[in-house]
Amino acid sequence: DVGDLKDKSFNQGTYDGVKLYANANSKSYKYYKPANGDKATDDDRYDAMKAAVDNGAEVVVAAGFLQAAALQKAATEFTDTKFVFIDGSPVDGLTNLAAISFREEQCGYLAGYAAVMEGYTKLGFCGGGGGTNDACCRYGYGYVQGAEAAAAEKNVNVEMNYTWKYGESFQPSAELQTLASGWYKNGTEVIFSCGGSIFDSITAAASANDAAVIGFDVGQS
């Protein structure tokens, strides 16, 4: 997907998991990065998978929903190779493709619940995917519900700002940092960031305003 192995998100978490498994089981592993970085196409992703298979990979692990088309093509062509699709959906008829998805709404619920129980009552949420990414939407829905549940228990009122506007590309931006900084200046105490590297924009705004951030995917402190 987009990003790199130091993105404090899916790529880093997936690669760390591959390394742990491989080292614990005396397996070899190698990272194949699609050409053109964040502008990679389906063909670029397929070429990276093909290179892995050509070099003898028995299992290919791909992270992120943008891998879907390339994975389907590769799994159809290389039937003797196993493919693992992190944050994806299964494809009918492809028995060599295993898809792993998550219940992001549960994670979001815990984040919202914990934030309010910690004493925060003015919350923010920034999601990736421009509002069309199911996983990021589930994080947001759970976050609101968790905050509401904790607020009811504590008998307090909670304010919530939320946006998916500047996270469509999952990349940091000056616009998102400005938006988050404005929230903080107007009283928002903590923002839950769900969308890959948009986390960098939120943390920059938080640092400038001595405020708090909730991360996701992997430890982002």
Set out the residue ranges of the language-model regions:
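A residue-level marker of the well-folded mature domains of exported/periplasmic proteins
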Residues: D1-S221
